Amino acid sequence: MAWISLILSLLALSSGAISQAVVTQESALTTSPGETVTLTCRSSTGAVTTSNYANWVQQKPDHLFTGLIGGTNNRAPGVPARFSGSLIGNKAALTITGAQTEDEAIYFCALWYSNHWVFGGGTKLTVLG
C-alpha cells in the first residue's frame, strides 16, 4: 500500500468522511528517554485483527506525516527498529522500545474496514527530558 494514499486518506478524514466504526486511541501518554511505551488502537466493532491492516502514522510538531507501520507489523522503509506493530489482546499496538526525545509526536492509528480506512483521534506522546 502506498503511504501517500494513507496520508491522503487521513487528510480526507478531516473533511467530514463518516463511518459506522469508531477507532479509539489514548489521548495522551508520557514516557522518558530509554523507556518502552505502547500505544493502542481499539475498534468499536470488536477485536482488531490482521484483516484490519492496522497502520500507524506519526505527525511531528512541524506537521509532517510519516508512515511507520503498515499491515499490523510491517515497518516502512527507513523507520527505526525501535518502532514495532502488533496485536495485543483485542487491540492493535505500536510499541516504541527505547524512546528518544525525537519520538515526541502525535501518533495516528488507521484500521481498514472492507472498503475504507477509519482513523483514531491520535495519541500525543510526550518524551520527557
Curated annotation (Swiss-Prot):
<keyword id="KW-0873">Pyrrolidone carboxylic acid</keyword>
<feature type="signal peptide">
    <location>
        <begin position="1"/>
        <end position="19"/>
    </location>
</feature>
<dbReference type="GO" id="GO:0006955">
    <property type="term" value="P:immune response"/>
</dbReference>
<keyword id="KW-1280">Immunoglobulin</keyword>
<keyword id="KW-0391">Immunity</keyword>
<dbReference type="GO" id="GO:0002250">
    <property type="term" value="P:adaptive immune response"/>
</dbReference>
<dbReference type="InterPro" id="IPR013106">
    <property type="entry name" value="Ig_V-set"/>
</dbReference>
<dbReference type="InterPro" id="IPR013783">
    <property type="entry name" value="Ig-like_fold"/>
</dbReference>
<feature type="modified residue" description="Pyrrolidone carboxylic acid">
    <location>
        <position position="20"/>
    </location>
</feature>
<dbReference type="GO" id="GO:0019814">
    <property type="term" value="C:immunoglobulin complex"/>
</dbReference>
<dbReference type="Pfam" id="PF07686">
    <property type="entry name" value="V-set"/>
</dbReference>
<dbReference type="InterPro" id="IPR007110">
    <property type="entry name" value="Ig-like_dom"/>
</dbReference>
<dbReference type="InterPro" id="IPR050150">
    <property type="entry name" value="IgV_Light_Chain"/>
</dbReference>
<dbReference type="InterPro" id="IPR003599">
    <property type="entry name" value="Ig_sub"/>
</dbReference>
<protein>
    <recommendedName>
        <fullName>Ig lambda-1 chain V regions MOPC 104E/RPC20/J558/S104</fullName>
    </recommendedName>
</protein>
<dbReference type="InterPro" id="IPR036179">
    <property type="entry name" value="Ig-like_dom_sf"/>
</dbReference>
<keyword id="KW-1064">Adaptive immunity</keyword>
<keyword id="KW-0732">Signal</keyword>
<feature type="domain" description="Ig-like">
    <location>
        <begin position="20"/>
        <end position="125"/>
    </location>
</feature>
